[in-house]
Amino acid sequence: MDFFRIVENQQPPATMPLNVSFTNRNYDLDYDSVQPYFYCDEEENFYQQQQQSELQPPAPSEDIWKKFELLPTPPLSPSRRSGLCSPSYVAVTPFSLRGDNDGGGGSFSTADQLEMVTELLGGDMVNQSFICDPDDETFIKNIIIQDCMWSGFSAAAKLVSEKLASYQAARKDSGSPNPARGHSVCSTSSLYLQDLSAAASECIDPSVVFPYPLNDSSSPKSCPSQDSSAFSPSSDSLLSSTESSPQGSPEPLVLHEETPPTTSSDSEEEQEDEEEIDVVSVEKRQAPGKRSESGSPSAGGHSKPPHSPLVLKRCHVSTHQHNYAAPPSTRKDYPAAKRVKLDSVRVLRQISNNRKCTSPRSSDTEENDKRRTHNVLERQRRNELKRSFFALRDQIPELENNEKAPKVVILKKATAYILSVQAEEQKLISEEDLLRKRREQLKHKLEQLRNSCA
């Protein structure tokens, strides 16, 4: 990045017109990168963005840290370009003050003021001045380093506003367009840069405050390694995370093992989802509040032990916060998946109970059916047996007309009758044989008689 160079003309002509000239560059992009750091009006509401995202005003304890007058944290990384890291490189470029058309004034226009302050705040010199020399151990033992709540957002805003006010007052005091005016303005600019350098020299090395370097928090899918020794010290990640933020303000650096940092818009969407969705567990209801609290912009930061996530966040607390003072809820809520699972288990239990209840009924019906079938078959068999007895009774001459004859009598009489019948049969058979023999004899005798007659 080019620098805004200021050179004092040693002997300018008395009739030299005052004008302002800058190097050819795209100032719009540079101004957009540092626009949140510039406040034209000292009475501007610095917390308008927080109020729009439904955040609380700064806590009363925040004013305690204004006495330290620290610059915005986290500090910006030094430039990697060769020859740009030393403040001695800050040269000044010739520029002349342009007089007004009315001839009486000589003050800068609003555009010139914006460009000048943009150059002063966006230069590599200022970015480099945010980091002190790592070899300098003067401020390492400072008590501020050991305080986990050290902050500089409000102090930096007050410092910038005071410097701009003094800078504008110094330009307004010099009323006549003469060489002394240009000399005073240039000296004021030099003093402003010196003040920034002096204030920046009181900063500390970020490697001392952050023993575990952080990855780039601006990337949406940051997945840092779980091993802290795997991180390599990189100050460019801090610089890129500060400059690549959409609003230019220092974003909270979150080192988390599972979830990436959330912005205020994400927290608002999660809060809306929390209001719309009811079928969630208590832990899931608390999670969006915690994530929105960690992602909400605040003015202070704090560090945690190495085993816990290292979070830098400002001290504005979201209104949508879990009330830990409230009594614990007695109602037990289950997630949707767990409810479905419980319902399915309940249905399976009911089905099993129904099966257990219906199995005796089915067995009884089967037994009844079998018994009924057996009874039918047995009745048929008895009926057939009865008819057989009746038929047998009808065949016995002694029991032919006795309808009340018992079965035993029928069987006995039937047996006696059969034996008698069989005996008679044998007798008849023997008689038949005798008769046949007699017939044969008679036939033979008849044949003999016919032969004798012939």
Swiss-Prot record:
GO biological process: chromatin remodeling; chromosome organization; DNA damage response; G1/S transition of mitotic cell cycle; intracellular iron ion homeostasis; MAPK cascade; negative regulation of apoptotic process; negative regulation of cell division
Keyword Acetylation attached: yes
Residue ranges of every copy of the bHLH domain listed in the record: 369-421
Ranges of Basic and acidic residues composition bias in the record: 281-293
Modified residues (Phosphothreonine): 23, 73, 330
Skewed-composition ranges (Polar residues): 350-362
UniProt crosslink position (Glycyl lysine isopeptide (Lys-Gly) (interchain with G-Cter in SUMO2)): 67, 158, 163, 313
Post-translational modification summary for this protein: Phosphorylated by PRKDC. Phosphorylation at Ser-344 by PIM2 leads to the stabilization of MYC. Phosphorylation at Ser-77 by CDK2 prevents Ras-induced senescence. Phosphorylated at Ser-77 by DYRK2; this primes the protein for subsequent phosphorylation by GSK3B at Thr-73. Phosphorylation at Thr-73 and Ser-77 by GSK3 is required for ubiquitination and degradation by the proteasome. Dephosphorylation at multiple sites by the PNUTS-PP1 complex promotes MYC stability by preventing ubiquitination by the SCF(FBXW7) complex.
Motif (9aaTAD): 115-123
Chain ranges passing through the membrane: none
Annotated region described as Leucine-zipper, given as residue ranges: 428-449
Start-end of Acidic residues biased regions: 266-278
Localization (cell): Nucleus, Nucleoplasm; Nucleus, Nucleolus; Nucleus; Cytoplasm
Low complexity bias spans: 216-252
Residues recorded as bearing Phosphoserine in the entry: 21, 77, 86, 96, 166, 174, 176, 308, 329, 344, 359, 362-363
GO molecular function terms listed in the Swiss-Prot or TrEMBL record: DNA binding; DNA-binding transcription factor activity, RNA polymerase II-specific; E-box binding; protein dimerization activity; protein-containing complex binding; RNA polymerase II cis-regulatory region sequence-specific DNA binding
SUPFAM superfamilies noted in UniProt: HLH, helix-loop-helix DNA-binding domain
Glycan attachment sites: 73
Domain of life: Eukaryota
Example of a GO cellular component annotation carried by this entry: nucleus
Miscellaneous information on this protein: Alternative translation initiation from an upstream, in-frame non-ATG (CTG) codon or a downstream ATG start site results in the production of 2 isoforms with distinct N-termini, shown in this entry as isoform 2 and isoform 1, respectively.
Binding partners and assembly: Efficient DNA binding requires dimerization with another bHLH protein. Binds DNA as a heterodimer with MAX. Interacts with TAF1C and SPAG9. Interacts with PARP10. Interacts with KDM5A and KDM5B. Interacts (when phosphorylated at Thr-73 and Ser-77) with FBXW7. Interacts with PIM2. Interacts with RIOX1. The heterodimer MYC:MAX interacts with ABI1; the interaction may enhance MYC:MAX transcriptional activity. Interacts with TRIM6. Interacts with NPM1; the binary complex is recruited to the promoter of MYC target genes and enhances their transcription.
Name of the protein in its database record: Myc proto-oncogene protein
Gene name of the encoded protein: MYC
